[in-house]
Amino acid sequence: MQNITHSWFVQGMIKATSDAWLKGWDERNGGNLTLRLDEADIAPFTDDFHQEPRYIALSQPMPLLANTPFIVTGSGKFFRNVQLDPAANLGVVKVDSDGAGYHILWGLNHEAVPTSELPAHFLSHCERINATDGKDRVIMHCHATNLIALTYVLENNTPLFTRKLWEGSTECLVVFPDGVGILPWMVPGTDEIGQATAQEMQKHSLVLWPFHGVFGSGPTLDETFGLIDTAEKSAEVLVKIYSMGGMKQTITREELVALGKRFGVTPLASALALY
């Protein structure tokens, strides 16, 4: 029988966390990643589960996630080490039948626990399940360097930030036509920032935490990584533009509209209406 470490979901988490570290997005224990699974995904690996799974109560019940398994990164764990010891740095957890807590079925060895941002992840999963009819399964948080840098120099509002990212790279409007949500600065690891992030996730697949990082959501690990990677590439272009004296020309409103029509997406109206 195949070991769980060779499963598609453990291998996918290893690749995503390794790639994110190589990108420079996840220094030290920065960043966290969760993937919503189905019972059928984990059923072949019950022999690998802990004999006495630890139970941890959630700070607030999440009945929408009842009986749902997830694979998650651990609190205080370094992304660069996931590939070296998946069972120490990742965990498969399953929310209980009333959504009040979860059991750690596999991994998170040596009394480790899931990421401190689990409230933000689970609340965001709930919103993205509703927003996408269950298609979105991944929530990824990382410290994408250039996106963070832009939060210091651009006005932190959704229409402006979205419009500038669309202008920074032609593919951006196609990849995230719903724009980028932005929070005020908040203390991380709290229910409050989790609730605020989830509220923005009702409308946007990308949410910026100013001076901190970004949250992204998507149907697969590849799609979610690619979403953040696309926004971060545009942010890198913008950082270079602003360091060279600013834009002399850019993609116009009319061109953005034409781009949306060509690829069958509806651009965020408030970003289009800016100028």
Curated annotation (Swiss-Prot):
Which superkingdom does the taxonomy of this entry point to? Bacteria
Entry-linked Pfam families: Aldolase_II (PF00596)
Per its UniProt record, the required cofactor names are: Zn(2+)
The reply on keyword Cytoplasm is yes
Top EC class of this enzyme = lyase
Per UniProt, Zn(2+) binds at H141, H143, H212
Q: Which HAMAP family match?
A: RhaD
Name this polypeptide is given: Rhamnulose-1-phosphate aldolase
Species this chain originates from: Citrobacter koseri (strain ATCC BAA-895 / CDC 4225-83 / SGSC4696)
- Which gene holds the coding sequence for this protein? rhaD
